[in-house]
Swiss-Prot record, chain A:
NCBIfam families to which the protein is assigned, alphabetical: NDH_I_N (TIGR01770)
PANTHER family, per the entry: NADH DEHYDROGENASE
Cellular location(s): Cell inner membrane
Keyword Phosphoprotein: no
Catalytic activity field: a quinone + NADH + 5 H(+)(in) = a quinol + NAD(+) + 4 H(+)(out)
Family listed: Belongs to the complex I subunit 2 family.
Keyword hit for S-adenosyl-L-methionine: no
Catalytic activity, EC: 7.1.1.-
Major site of localization recorded for this protein: membrane
Identification of the protein by name: NADH-quinone oxidoreductase subunit N 1
One annotated Gene Ontology cellular component of this protein: plasma membrane
Length: 481, 493
């Protein structure tokens, strides 16, 4: 490996070192605030070296990684999200009676896994990244280990993850049997030269890989775990699961899709189109039936993964841009929405029922306002970043003339409006007097509130003036294609 | 810059009104009056300072424009402009905004600042809709105004406010999404034909997609606008929303929001797709006639005053739809006058209904009876607006309906004849209001205050405007004429 390789890999190396160092710190001296500050410093450092790595990109680090603008962009997104979750989680973890410090170590490890996914260019690194991410997530999900729901969520995710890993491995094996290659680049050259004798094994392998990744992305019909796990997990971990873990897997999927020239495989496209339609409809319809905010947001995030699939299928330059832009929007909206749940909750008392939010506007106007913005953005109402994201996907869909998918998207958005409005209406209902008394004006965690305010600012800023972000994303999309 | 200022005054005014609630509950009300009054005067000045205020002419009839790049990646521009048509509707918007503030003066008792914030932001959105010349920008305003309107209904509405606000939002947002896809397809077709990606109205006028595509895109626009109008099979959100909204909200809904749908048809549907719209005109006119008759018949069957006015709005907006698709000079002028006159008369009727509800705590007409004896001012004014709504010659509504029917007669005799039946049905329901609420013996001996001076000033202004529109509408014709002629020329080519 040359020094250029090291420079390119700096973000990955730093975050690995950071998680090790943090483990040592925690082993030596347990102090919640110190651990949290160390985590923040580590993440900021990782973010700071991204421009250094960008200077030498695109850099292949054979055979496992490719560090290009695309990978670095997603790494930036992942680290920023981890930063936001650390800030949000601090207030929440204070409520945990015993030892909140390892939470941050696990958070860094999970981010490492996610970052590896964003940069991986080989099935081996894909699998490694995915396993690092998943294993840290089991522990994170079950972190408040005295609570049955969290344990249940952890176990569910564990079983699901092993199943999806098995499928993934089998898929890789089939592809290896057919092509003798495990690197995405090799695959792409093999495919373009038409060296494949029969496509059956290759497609079956690809389908199995899609299934394995589909579990992680909670596409229908692989979505059954999502709502339970979201509900059971501690609120900040739910935020992490919804954003970072899904975003990294999708980033990888998009890279794979572009490398194997997805649009060329008709069967795959048909299959994914079915999945997209089913995901959008089922996600939205099931969300309608819920009374638990975390479950509603879980199903809504399933639906949003369906929308992203529409952009993926549109492919082309605009499709890739749409996916990337939508991920930025998705990160902001979901971190914000789960963030509101987080700052109101504590490990002993998760505020997750719609009832808990009734009349929030009357005693916490700021928080209710932030939540309203997040929900309106999820619903895709203009002047929020969610609208621009939706517009991007619509534009990509219209360009690729995916009418069926677009109309499903419209149907899904209309259905979605029902449950977003239901939450919003609950926020603004006049509370009964006893409710008012219950809502003790306990102070909110300062850092969490600041983070939420910042997210709202970004949500509106990029919703009103998305041009700077669009320029960056154009460059990112260019790097991939 | 004036155009930006118009929006900024309302947006900033809304924020200030929200904050000002802390000091005194009167502050938000005065700030709203100030912001809207300021806008109204600016618009009026803009009109009167034209070289020849009663005959606006010139290239494209744009009085004032503002064009800045916004999202270059998609060719989206921040392009606002006013012509005679937009100016008239903008004036109506600010005027009814003032009325809505007056109407909510005593009705809104909690979260006054937030109420006025929402009110001003709805009006900012509506003004934006009337001024936007970039389809993306138009869509943004179109959707943004829904949110504060939704809050107005959902927070300050009457007993069944939640389902009503849901219905309102879902219907109009569904239409909005269709509109968005239609806009995108139009822009992309243009992009394929010319290689230039733009959402500019003026550029897209020449987009000329192939007939089949044009028909589908036109349908997307048409459905979105007729939901808002509303035309008959798509109307079912309107009676609920109007009935449940607070008085100020109803005034804005009936007076201004419905006009955005009509404006969309006039400004976008026919000029952008002249051929497809001409082919589609019989269906659209049929929908217009259906709306006229259906709205009038159902209005007749209502017990709830606000519901009655809501259904009568459907009937009156049917005339606008008829006039727009008859697409000749007379019918278009009629449609514009009808939009203004209905804005004023429906706004006034909702204010009266709101005043009655505040005093009697019911909207049921069976329980009203005998108002003449108890509140002569309210009664006299109700009578005036009831006969205005039924189309008494000499008042604005008559002028609008008459011109629409005259124009429709040239385009299609059967539709004109069927539409004229609506005038008869209007008499029935208007007289029912008068009979049930004003005459007869009061059910119980009630004591309540009559209209105050403030209310009388508001009502008096509206009465004068209706007289003006009915007796001397020429200035309005002159003002709208160049814009309408410009639109018509677009479809000739």
């Amino acid at each position: 490996m040359s020094s250029l390789d090291f420079t390119a890999l700096l973000p990955l190396i730093l975050i690995t070192l950071a998680s090790l160092t943090l483990t040592l710190i925690v082993a030596g001296y347990r102090q919640h605030r110190l651990t949290m500050v160390a985590t923040l410093i580590a993440l900021v450092l990782c973010l700071a070296v991204i421009p250094l790595a960008a200077a030498v990109s695109p850099q292949h680090v054979p055979p496992l990684f490719i560090i290009d603008r695309y990978a670095l962009f997603y790494m930036g997104l992942i680290f920023t999200a981890a930063l936001a979750i650390t800030l949000l989680a601090y207030g929440y973890m204070k409520g945990l009676v015993d030892q909140p410090e390892e939470f941050y170590v696990l958070l860094l490890l999970a981010s490492l896994g996610a970052a590896i996914l964003a940069a991986s260019n080989h099935f081996a690194s894909l699998f490694l990244g995915l396993e690092i991410l998943s294993v840290s997530l089991f522990a994170l999900l079950a972190y408040p280990r005295r609570f049955q729901l969290s344990l249940e969520a952890g176990v569910k995710y564990l079983i699901l993850s092993s199943a999806s890993s098995a499928l993934l491995l089998f898929g890789m094996a089939l592809i290896y049997a057919e092509t003798g290659a495990l690197g995405f680049g090799q695959l792409s050259t093999l495919l373009s030269t038409g060296a494949l004798s029969s496509e059956i094994f290759f497609l079956a392998g690809l389908a199995l890989i899609m299934t394995g990744l589909g579990f992680k992305l909670s596409w229908v019909p692989f979505h059954l775990w999502a709502a339970d796990v979201y509900q059971g997990a501690p609120a900040p971990v739910t935020a992490f699961l919804a954003t970072v873990s899904k975003g990294a897997v999708f980033a990888l999927l998009l890279r794979l899709f572009v490398q194997v020239d997805g649009p060329q495989h008709h069967t795959l496209i048909v299959l994914l189109s079915f999945i997209a339609v089913a995901t959008i409809l089922a996600g939205n319809l099931l969300a309608l039936l819920q009374n638990n905010i975390k479950r509603i947001l879980a199903y809504s995030s399933i639906a949003h993964l369906g929308y992203l699939l529409v952009a993926l299928l549109a492919s082309g330059n605009l499709g890739v841009e749409a996916v990337t832009f939508y991920w930025v929007a998705y990160f902001i909206m979901n971190l914000g929405a789960f963030g509101v749940v987080t700052v109101l909750s504590s490990p002993t008392q998760e505020k997750e029922n719609l009832e808990d939010y009734r009349g929030l506007f009357w005693h916490r106007p700021g928080l209710a306002g932030i939540f309203t913005f997040m929900l309106l953005s999820l619903a895709g109402i203009p002047l929020t970043v969610g609208f621009i994201g939706k517009f991007y996907i619509f534009a990509a869909g219209v360009e690729a003339t995916l009418w069926l998918l677009l109309f499903t998207f419209v149907m899904g958005s209309i259905l979605g409006l029902f449950y977003y409005l239901r939450i919003i209406i609950a926020l603004y209902q006049t509370p009964t007097i006893e409710k008012e008394a219950l809502a003790s004006p306990s102070s909110l965690p300062l850092m969490g509130s600041l983070t939420l305010a910042l997210l709202t600012l970004l949500l509106i800023w990029w919703g009103v003036y998305p041009d700077p972000l669009m320029r960056i994303i154009q460059a990112v999309a260019m790097a991939l294609i | 810059m004036i155009l930006i200022a118009l929006l900024a005054i309302l947006i900033v005014g809304g924020l200030v009104a929200w904050v000002a609630e802390r000091w005194h509950p009167l502050w938000p009300r005065f700030i709203s009056l100030l912001a809207l009054g300021c806008n109204f005067l600016v618009l009026l000045a803009l009109w009167l300072w034209q070289p020849d205020p009663f005959m606006i002419n010139g290239q494209g009839a744009w009085l004032i424009t503002l064009d800045r790049p916004w999202i270059p990646h998609f060719g989206v521009r921040f392009h606002l402009a006013l012509d005679g048509l937009s100016l008239l509707l903008a004036l109506l918007t600010c005027f009814l905004g003032l009325m809505a503030v007056v109407a909510s003066w005593t009705e809104i008792k909690y979260r006054i600042g937030f109420f006025h914030f929402n009110l001003l932001w709805v009006l900012a959105g509506v003004l934006g809709v009337f001024m936007a010349l970039d389809l993306f920008l138009f869509f943004v305003f179109w959707e943004v105004m829904l949110v504060p309107m939704y809050f107005l209904i959902a927070i300050w509405g009457h007993e069944h406010r939640h389902p009503a606000s849901f219905k309102f939002f879902i219907f109009t947002h569904s239409g909005g999404l269709l509109l968005l896809i239609a806009i995108l397809e139009l822009a992309w077709t243009h992009h394929q034909n010319t290689g230039e990606l733009t959402f500019s109205y003026l550029d897209l006028l020449g987009a000329s997609p192939d007939p089949e595509t044009a028909f589908w895109i036109m349908l997307g626009f048409f459905i979105a606008f007729t939901i808002k109008l509303p035309a008959v099979p798509l109307h079912s959100w309107l009676p609920d929303a109007h009935t449940q909204a607070p008085t100020g909200g109803s005034v804005i809904l009936a007076g201004v929001l419905l006009k955005t749908g009509a404006y969309g048809l006039l400004r976008f549907v026919v000029p952008l797709f002249p051929v497809a719209a001409a082919e589609f005109a019989p269906v659209a006119m049929l929908m217009g006639v259906m709306g006229i008759l259906y709205g009038a018949v159902l209005a007749f069957a209502q017990q709830d005053v606000k519901r009655l006015i809501a259904y009568s709005s459907i009937s009156h907006m049917g005339f606008v739809l008829l006039g727009v698709f008859a697409w000749n000079a007379v019918a278009l002028q009629g449609a514009v006058i009808q939009m203004l006159a209905h804005g004023i008369s429906a706004g006034a009727l909702f204010m009266i209904a709101g005043a009655l509800q505040e005093r009697l705590h019911t909207r049921n007409m069976r329980r009203m009876g005998g108002l003449w004896a108890q509140a002569p001012r309210i009664a006299a004014i109700s009578l005036f607006f009831a006969v205005a709504a039924l189309g008494l010659p000499g008042l604005g509504n008559f002028m609008g309906e008459f011109l629409v029917l005259l124009g429709t007669y040239r385009a299609s005799v059967p539709f004109a004849a069927a539409g004229a039946l609506g005038l008869i049905l209007a008499v029935v329901y208007a007289l029912i209001i008068v009979q049930k609420t004003l005459h007869g013996e009061p059910e119980e001996q009630r004591h309540f205050t009559d209209f105050s001076t403030k209310d009388m000033v508001a009502m008096g202004t509206m009465i004068l405007i209706l007289f003006w529109l009915g007796l001397y509408p020429q200035p309005v014709f002159d003002m709208a004429h160049p814009a309408l002629e410009g639109l018509q020329q677009l479809t000739m080519e």
